[in-house]
């Protein structure tokens, strides 16, 4: 990360000089915003959340100006949405759930407008599902399981439509599996083990297919392990130790 940070910092110097010289060029402004975002990602990866927050705040500042100046440009609006999302992630990592919720709500507002305006754009639809998912995560962290369930269900509905429309896209299939896991976690927290088992079983079905199709993808293999583990937890909660042992062994 240190080497990457050095390269990005040098690129940032050049980008800052260019935007100072040509302040009206939106592409140069967007490049500058992107570099702040990259440096924020590096800082976050090194667990330096304060530095990350500073970089993401600079990204947001530029994104807000561009989105205001070019309200009909979906990319500028999407950049703004992503900036709120990144700051929400930092606030969440710092356990500041109020701030995180505020950022994620702004992200959702933009994502909803874009998804409504461009219903056939899978990336914008996927972005909307992620926005719901993020808010669901905050509600879950606060033990507001009803709100979490509502947000996760909205995310799942979008992901199911996308997975049906693009059956060969592994990321869209994976998103669906993650939604089932999230809903299973909520059902488990509410002690509804039958519902939880049903959700986890659906996640397992998808994870199995993906892990088989992409045996060299570590994330998909990990997803499969998580699915088995979750089903093991349910079996254990139901005192079915034989089944639990079987699931844990596969995990």
Model-predicted regions and their roles:
Residues 1-251:
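Thr-biased low-complexity repeat/linker tracts and other Thr-enriched repetitive architectures
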């Amino acid at each position: 990360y240190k080497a990457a940070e050095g390269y990005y910092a040098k690129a940032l110097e050049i980008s800052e000089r260019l935007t100072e010289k040509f302040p009206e060029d939106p592409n140069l402004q967007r490049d500058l915003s992107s570099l702040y975002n990259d440096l924020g990602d590096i800082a976050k990866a090194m667990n330096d959340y304060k530095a990350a927050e500073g970089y993401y705040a600079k990204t947001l500042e530029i994104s807000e100006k561009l989105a205001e100046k070019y309200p009909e440009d979906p990319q500028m609006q999407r950049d703004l949405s992503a900036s709120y999302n990144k700051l929400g992630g930092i606030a969440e990592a710092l356990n500041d759930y109020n701030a995180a919720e505020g950022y994620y709500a702004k992200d959702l507002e933009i994502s909803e407008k874009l998804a409504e305006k461009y219903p056939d754009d899978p990336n914008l639809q996927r972005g909307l599902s992620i926005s719901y998912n993020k808010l669901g995560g905050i509600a879950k962290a606060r033990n507001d399981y009803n709100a979490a369930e509502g947000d996760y269900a909205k995310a799942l509905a979008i992901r199911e439509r996308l997975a049906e429309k693009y059956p060969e896209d592994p990321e869209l299939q994976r998103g669906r599996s993650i939604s089932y896991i999230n809903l299973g976690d909520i059902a488990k927290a509410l002690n509804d083990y039958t519902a939880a088992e049903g959700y986890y079983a659906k996640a397992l079905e998808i994870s199995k297919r993906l892990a088989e199709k992409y045996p060299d993808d570590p994330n998909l293999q990990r997803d499969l392990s998580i699915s088995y583990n979750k089903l093991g937890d349910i079996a254990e909660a139901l005192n079915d130790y034989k089944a639990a042992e079987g699931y844990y062994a596969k995990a």
